[in-house]
């Protein structure tokens, strides 16, 4: 699976910028780069930087800072040369074209990371974390990916694997020497399987929370028609995302908008106003609104302070809820006692929105990862394979209770190890690797 050629690509995003980076990796990275650079790259020590000019066939291309990282002390485990040139499209693209003319090959998406994996610099779990780091759009998603890239998830998986291997080795001894009549009901292999199950179960149980943290906390704006839900959504996000009119029932479907508040990602969900209606389309919208309220993690219950107080749905008392008295610029809200926070706002003037943001921030901080080293699963691939591990370990444990032959228990444990191998990459197929790394950007 290892490639012996030398690859190159632009490692920075396209478009205008102060600096662009061109990366070269492979056995001929130094010799190819040396032919287009004014300095002596072949003579440079590893992990040093040198300023010079890039040219080809005596034609000047750009000034660049060259970084040399010799194998195996590099990201890919191969010789790497990086050219830091002026930003924009033309300088870096001309450097790439020159490197291609000198014998390098254009890198495939994720090929640098794939080489790092194939050369043992990172495992597959860490490699996948690279793409998660790049794609993270909020602080929680970034920290989850950071923990994964630092190897915390891999360490937990390795612990599961070690426990299974220890149990399997003991069981195989029992299978090879059945005449010893060793008692296994409360023996070492059973205890090791139970330990492995405990770690696996903890990882699996983190998936839903990990998904929520990575994708954002869902908060639905709900209330009667014309209470100002859509106006508040637009005011918070500073976008004209939702249609606003004086006609009740304008919003008839779920409208979702991502909103980052102090680095925390929220999914604000605008919903249809709740009321009795015979309009089939609006009725469907109301049904979806109620479903959104049941699925959301928090509710902003919007009330028009100038109108009679509506009845509060039971679900408001079952979830984190903030009561928003809208239109406080024209009327003072009534004084009522409810078990959730009340904030007076005006979607029209912006009054009270700062207090609302502070309240949301305070609530979100209760779910903030901070510097916690807790591991969260966010990959569906990881969850599926770990679920397979859990199933196999459960079957193996039941094998003791049902007094199954040791060979049957060993078979379940080997299957669990196979799933772990697919997870870490030690037994993964080339097709799976291709699918994973093809989602990466070129140059990473």
UniProtKB/Swiss-Prot annotation:
Summary of the function given for this chain in its UniProt record: Exhibits a very high intrinsic GTPase hydrolysis rate. Involved in the addition of a carboxymethylaminomethyl (cmnm) group at the wobble position (U34) of certain tRNAs, forming tRNA-cmnm(5)s(2)U34.
EC numbers, comma separated: 3.6.-.-
The protein's name: tRNA modification GTPase MnmE
Subunit structure: Homodimer. Heterotetramer of two MnmE and two MnmG subunits.
Molecular function GO terms recorded: GTP binding; GTPase activity; metal ion binding
Enzyme category, top tier: hydrolase
Localisation per UniProt entry: Cytoplasm
Family, as annotated: Belongs to the TRAFAC class TrmE-Era-EngA-EngB-Septin-like GTPase superfamily. TrmE GTPase family.
Cofactor note: Binds 1 potassium ion per subunit.
A Gene Ontology BP annotation from the UniProt entry: tRNA methylation
Binding site for K(+): 226, 245, 247, 250
SUPFAM superfamilies, alphabetized: P-loop containing nucleoside triphosphate hydrolases
Keyword field: Cytoplasm, GTP-binding, Hydrolase, Magnesium, Metal-binding, Nucleotide-binding, Potassium, tRNA processing
Binding site for (6S)-5-formyl-5,6,7,8-tetrahydrofolate: 23, 82, 121, 444
Positions with a binding annotation for Mg(2+): 230, 251
Cofactor(s) required, per the database record: K(+)
InterPro entries per record: G_TrmE, GTP-bd, GTP-bd_TrmE_N, GTPase_MnmE, MnmE_dom2, MnmE_helical, P-loop_NTPase, Small_GTP-bd
A Pfam family this chain is assigned to: TrmE_N
């Amino acid at each position: 699976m290892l490639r012996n050629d030398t690859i190159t690509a632009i490692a920075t995003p396209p478009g205008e910028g102060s600096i662009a980076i061109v990366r070269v990796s492979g056995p001929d990275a130094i010799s190819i780069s040396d032919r287009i650079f004014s300095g002596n790259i072949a003579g440079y020590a590893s992990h040093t930087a040198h300023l010079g000019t890039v040219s080809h066939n005596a034609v000047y291309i750009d000034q660049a800072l060259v970084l040399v990282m010799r194998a195996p002390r590099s990201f890919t485990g191969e010789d790497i040369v990086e050219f830091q040139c002026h930003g924009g499209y033309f300088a870096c693209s001309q450097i790439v074209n020159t490197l291609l003319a000198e014998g390098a090959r254009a890198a495939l998406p994720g090929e640098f990371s794939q080489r790092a994996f194939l050369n043992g610099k990172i495992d597959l779990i860490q490699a996948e974390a690279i793409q998660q780091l790049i794609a993270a759009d909020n602080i929680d998603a970034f920290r989850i990916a950071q923990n994964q890239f630092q190897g915390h998830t891999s360490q937990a998986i390795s612990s599961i694997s070690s426990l299974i291997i220890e149990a399997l080795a003991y069981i195989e001894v029992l299978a090879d020497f059945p005449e010893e009549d060793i008692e296994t009901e409360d023996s070492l292999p059973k205890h090791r399987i139970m330990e492995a199950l405990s770690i696996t179960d903890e990882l699996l149980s983190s998936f839903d929370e990990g998904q929520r943290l990575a994708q954002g906390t869902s908060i639905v704006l709900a209330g009667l028609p014309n209470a100002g839900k859509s106006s508040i959504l637009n005011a918070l996000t500073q976008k004209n995302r939702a249609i606003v009119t004086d006609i009740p029932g304008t919003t008839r479907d779920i409208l979702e908008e991502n909103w980052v508040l102090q680095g925390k990602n929220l999914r604000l969900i605008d919903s249809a106003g709740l009321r009795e209606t015979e309009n089939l389309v609006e009725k469907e919208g109301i049904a979806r609104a109620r479903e959104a309220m049941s699925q959301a993690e928090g509710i902003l219950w919007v009330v028009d302070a100038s109108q009679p107080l509506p009845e509060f749905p039971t679900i408001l008392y079952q979830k984190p809820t903030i009561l928003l008295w809208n239109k406080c610029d024209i009327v003072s809200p009534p004084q009522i006692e409810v078990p959730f926070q009340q904030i007076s706002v005006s979607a029209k003037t912006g009054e009270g929105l700062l207090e609302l943001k502070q309240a949301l921030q305070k609530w979100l901080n209760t779910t903030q990862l901070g510097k916690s080293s807790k591991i969260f699963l966010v990959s569906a691939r990881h969850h599926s394979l770990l679920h397979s591990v859990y199933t196999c370990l459960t079957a193996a444990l039941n094998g003791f209770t049902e007094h199954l032959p040791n060979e049957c228990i060993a078979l379940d444990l080997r299957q669990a190890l196979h799933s772990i191998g697919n997870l870490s990459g030690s037994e993964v197929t080339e097709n799976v690797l291709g699918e994973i790394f093809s989602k990466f950007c070129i140059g990473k």
